[in-house]
């Protein structure tokens, strides 16, 4: 078995080395936070594989807060949106996060934020210097991100083939995958694949709500499309999603629910993983103080650190103070409540090497917001979780974590110090959580190809074959009435009704003939 895997790996990699040439690849990141980090990692991997990679990247402190900027192995084209655009984005993003933190419906705030992104995209497309430079480079392939609609429009403007990456689990975007509603949960439903009758009713109804939300978000770019594409050749965003040669998905079946896939869909969950390094000496010394009790890691992602309320910070601190473990917490010191004296077992830092700490043998628990990259890192290192999801895909991610027994989830707006303390102790002491997530880690590590190898292998494949037409079903080109057999249903229904009508007519004729025959007989 091991020999077969080695041969498969060697054959897969050699085919790329022998048949592919260095391609010019453009990656696009106009969003910040984890969206940027994922595209940065993709760019690094493709550059290391021998391709010539350039990232078109929107710079700004708001977009990449608390992220250590390192020298890039690939080329970067940086651009800045006007200051008034940046202020509007920050204002609407803050409003969106506050809406989520309050537990209110996020969709309206998200649509308003997308409208600002549409305006920003229009500005970028009007930058003749940037667009002409990109056209002159004549890239072989463009790499776009699912929620960055502007990146799809740039690829279309350049008239270049493109591949896309979905930074979340399936369901948060419709790009043509078959999704049976009986066991594939719709994105905002917070259901698992094990649905009872009422769960299936909810999932069915939420499908229409989700479709409407997608239409609302995509329509925020209508004005941008009208402004920058001539009438008669204006793209439709929902069609561009189907046009992608490949879809890479930042997930894995060790985490996600099993579901149907198409040939042009590739799982690369765990792509963010890098070689483990020793943790910084000051953190290692802090961990050593707690001996066998170990430590708890607390991290809430690149964007949420600056939006934690003072009240929530106090509740969390009170909960951590009651643990026998040490607690390493990424929390900006400038946001720390001045009236709170830090507990002796709690250490706050502005930045920490999350993956290295998750790999530390003394870690006992990961307290997280439930972001996709964070959850995948925890699973890879076999660390159980307590999730405090806030927005977007985080709630759905924690539904999967709970369903697979990798941890427990608490709504952030309902958390209390006592509840959080009891939940953390429960997950640390109940070894079933640790066993389940360690088993998931084995699933991730035992795959014949790593996420990075799958990424470069499939990129090389479509570069060599000139696209992925052979991987796309004809359904992408079918009218909806053909795809869902509406025409067949109407035909068969008409045929059935016509046959019934004809039979009825014939029976009527026979009945009248029989009645007439009886009358003749009587006379």
UniProtKB/Swiss-Prot annotation:
Gene name, Swiss-Prot/TrEMBL: UGT3A1
Gene3D superfamilies: Glycogen Phosphorylase B
Residue positions the entry lists as glycosylated: 52
Membrane topology qualifier: Single-pass type I membrane protein
Cytoplasmic compartment residues: 505-523
Annotated catalysed reactions: glucuronate acceptor + UDP-alpha-D-glucuronate = acceptor beta-D-glucuronoside + UDP + H(+)
PROSITE patterns tied to this protein: UDPGT
Extracellular side: 23-483
This protein's GO CC annotations: UDP-N-acetylglucosamine transferase complex
Enzyme nomenclature, EC number: 2.4.1.17
The protein's name in its UniProt record: UDP-glucuronosyltransferase 3A1
Transmembrane spans: 484-504
Organism: Homo sapiens
Location(s), subcellular: Membrane
Predominant location category: membrane
UniProt keyword terms in alphabetical order: Glycoprotein, Glycosyltransferase, Membrane, Signal, Transferase, Transmembrane, Transmembrane helix
InterPro entries: UDP-glycosyltransferase (IPR050271), UDP_glucos_trans (IPR002213), UDP_glycos_trans_CS (IPR035595)
Record GO terms (molecular function): glucuronosyltransferase activity; UDP-glycosyltransferase activity
The protein's role, per its UniProt record: UDP-glucuronosyltransferases catalyze phase II biotransformation reactions in which lipophilic substrates are conjugated with glucuronic acid to increase water solubility and enhance excretion. They are of major importance in the conjugation and subsequent elimination of potentially toxic xenobiotics and endogenous compounds.
Signal peptide: 1-22
Family of the protein in this entry: Belongs to the UDP-glycosyltransferase family.
